[in-house]
Each structure stands twice: as structure tokens, then as C-alpha cells.
């Protein structure tokens, strides 16, 4: 059976948060209580289903961590997540939101992550990710067509292990 797009790296970094997140947890025993960072590729519902974040709230989840899960998303996804936090009255102790911009690298959980502009529905603020940790790197690129010149230049300029 096909489910919606999601990936996990080292049981620490989650990529995308679709409605199937809980199903993925059940089927593959994803340690959702240990994941502290989630990067969002774009705001289409098969990659981001903001209503699902309320399941991290008290009454639904029993997470023995004092550190909230941080979601990193470009403008459209960030706005959808912020709306869900307000709508479901989610505490800052459960969720932390970070607005990212294409081509501006950031660090989280030991990874250096570079969001790169994807070619997809512009309203969804699409990005692909170059992810690096220690001497390993990964390009996570889906739901994109041919990349623009700026994105190709960014990829070529990235340091390779």
C-alpha cells in the first residue's frame, strides 16, 4: 500500500509531516518521541498535514522530553503550521517553528541543511534539501522539475565530502 511522502535520517531528522505520519510510526516503529527536528519540503497536503501536530500535545501524546519538536519550513508551510498552532492551542513546549529561506543554510541536530528552491507549485514554497553531517551528505529532492539556474549554481557550490 502506498502512503504519502516522508523520510527519516538516523532516527533523528524527519522529512515532511503528512497525514500518514502515525501510520508510518506504527508500521516502521519510527521513534516519534525522540525526533526533535522536522524539515518540510512544501505545503501540499501529501507532505504537510498541520492538523496532525496536535497529536504531540498533552492528552494525546506522552513524551518524556522537555525539548519541543522544531519544524523548519519555508513561507507557505510555516504559515500553515503557525495557523495550526493557534487553532489547536498547541503549547510552545510541544512545537517550535522556524521560518527558512531557500539558499540559507541552518544547523539542527548535528546536520547542516541547505534548502534549495525547487521547481513545483510556487504557492507551496517548494524546496529540496542538501543535508550534511560529518563526512556524509544527501540530496533529498522530490516533487521538482528541472531546477532553475540559481538552484543548480547552489548545488554546484556545495562542499562535497
Where are these regions (language model features)?
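Core dinuclear metal-dependent hydrolase active-site scaffold
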Residues: 1-30, 98-153
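Active-site metal-binding motif and surrounding structural segment of the metallo-beta-lactamase
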Residues: 12, 18-70
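Short hydrophobic/aromatic-enriched beta-strand-loop microsegments
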Residues: 33-37, 92-98
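Short, well-ordered, mixed-charge alpha-helical segments that flank or form enzyme active sites
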Residues: 47-48, 79-82, 122-124
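A short helix-to-beta-strand connector/capping loop
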Residues: 67-68, 90-96, 109
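Short, aromatic/basic amphipathic alpha-helical patches
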Residues: 81-92
Amino acid at each position: 500500500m502506498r502512503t504519502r511522502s516522508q523520510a527519516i535520517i538516523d532516527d533523528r531528522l524527519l522529512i515532511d509531516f503528512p497525514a500518514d505520519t502515525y501510520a508510518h510510526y506504527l508500521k516502521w516503529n519510527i521513534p516519534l518521541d525522540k525526533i526533535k527536528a522536522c524539515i518540510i519540503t512544501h505545503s501540499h497536503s501529501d507532505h504537510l498535514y498541520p492538523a496532525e501536530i496536535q497529536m504531540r500535545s498533552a492528552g494525546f501524546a506522552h513524551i518524556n522530553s522537555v525539548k519541543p519538536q522544531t519544524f523548519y519550513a519555508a513561507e507557505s508551510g510555516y504559515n500553515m503550521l503557525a495557523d495550526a498552532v493557534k487553532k489547536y492551542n498547541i503549547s510552545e513546549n510541544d512545537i517550535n517553528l522556524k521560518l527558512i529561506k531557500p539558499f540559507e543554510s541552518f544547523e539542527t541536530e548535528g546536520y547542516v541543511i541547505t534548502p534549495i528552491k525547487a521547481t513545483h507549485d510556487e504557492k507551496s514554497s517548494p524546496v529540496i534539501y542538501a543535508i550534511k553531517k560529518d563526512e556524509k551528505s544527501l540530496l533529498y529532492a522530490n516533487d521538482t522539475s528541472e531546477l532553475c539556474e540559481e538552484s543548480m549554481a547552489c548545488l554546484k557550490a556545495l562542499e562535497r565530502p
